[in-house]
């Protein structure tokens, strides 16, 4: 009985540690898009702070940081993609403006799940 209780306590403690562990960041290239109908069924415009990611669940919020200038923005995943070679995320026009990447069209970024 004591062995089972000890095992249960250890499992609960390990679950708590796993739940509080920091989520690893993803780094790569980002581009931006001008809006339209998304894979989630939502219609977005240029002014929303949204993004497309291949695997993150819809509704997930991520912090995107432009590695060349340090600017960051929080976006909500509402679409699938990007489908461009070498990219890890596509952000909305408004988010791209905040990241300072409108002129270049793409940027090297870090994506942190929030």
Where are these regions (language model features)?
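Secreted/periplasmic proteins
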Residues: 2-13, 17-114
């Amino acid at each position: 009985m004591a062995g089972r209780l000890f095992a249960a306590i250890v499992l609960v403690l390990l679950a708590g540690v796993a739940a509080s562990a920091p989520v690893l960041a993803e780094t790569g290239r980002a581009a931006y898009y001008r809006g339209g109908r998304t894979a989630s069924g939502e219609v977005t415009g240029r002014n929303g702070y949204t993004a497309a990611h291949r695997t993150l669940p819809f509704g997930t919020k991520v912090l995107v940081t432009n590695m060349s200038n340090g600017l960051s923005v929080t976006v909500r995943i509402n679409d699938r993609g990007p489908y461009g070679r070498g990219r890890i995320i596509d952000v909305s026009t408004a988010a791209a403006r905040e990241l300072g990447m409108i002129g270049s069209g793409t940027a090297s970024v870090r994506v942190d799940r929030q």
